[in-house]
């Protein structure tokens, strides 16, 4: 939300209101001039969604049902998940057709990946049989770091073609962009980070990482 240049004080309805069934997804959408995306924004209310969802019937399907109403409006819907495996993440996995997993090439990230893959398998078995892992994206990569290279090699060895060829480097301009409320493409399109994300977009659209 912040990265899209949206002022949180101007949000009337957020994705939280959608998840608890108070408004439709369409009622929350704001157009981001900074990123050219339509965004269903989030604010501090989302922190309470986990508790509020507990008492809702078929709570795992709230986001899926909301997105379903807008299927004919958008070609792509991107769901930005929290870094924790909770009910919000489960809602995202139930709603999604594919999962893109961004991952730092560090030991603890590798350990967490195992937990996430296990969760995706359980969701696929019990709640969303069509979900697939679209790909793994190596991010904040520092080629000078020996451990990063080792983890990268291990990912490629274990997941093969599921690992994107594109690698997102550790880049100062990428780190600066969110504080300016801009996507990397609009903050500094010539930066190594922005060019890497453009290459990733092309790879995803062409599906070349699975070749």
What is each stretch, according to the model?
Residues 1-211:
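P-loop NTP-binding core
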């Amino acid at each position: 939300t912040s990265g899209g240049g949206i002022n949180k004080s101007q949000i009337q309805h957020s994705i939280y209101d959608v998840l608890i069934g108070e408004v439709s997804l369409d009622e929350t959408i704001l157009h981001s001039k900074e990123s050219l995306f339509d965004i269903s924004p989030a604010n501090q209310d989302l922190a309470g969604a986990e508790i509020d969802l507990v008492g809702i019937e078929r709570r795992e399907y709230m986001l899926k049902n909301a997105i379903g109403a807008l299927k004919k409006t958008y070609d792509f819907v991107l769901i930005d998940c929290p870094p924790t495996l909770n009910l919000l993440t489960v809602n995202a996995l139930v709603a999604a057709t594919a999962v893109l997993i961004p991952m730092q090439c560090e030991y603890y990230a590798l350990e967490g990946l195992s937990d996430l893959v296990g969760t995706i398998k359980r969701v696929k078995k019990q709640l969303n049989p069509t979900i697939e892992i679209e790909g793994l994206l190596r991010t904040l990569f520092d080629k000078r770091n020996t451990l990063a290279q080792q983890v990268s090699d291990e990912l490629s060895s274990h997941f093969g073609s599921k690992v994107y060829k594109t690698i997102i480097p550790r880049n100062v301009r990428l780190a600066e962009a969110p504080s300016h409320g801009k996507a990397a493409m609009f903050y500094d399109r010539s930066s190594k980070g922005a060019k890497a994300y453009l290459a990733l977009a092309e790879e995803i659209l062409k599906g070349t990482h699975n070749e």
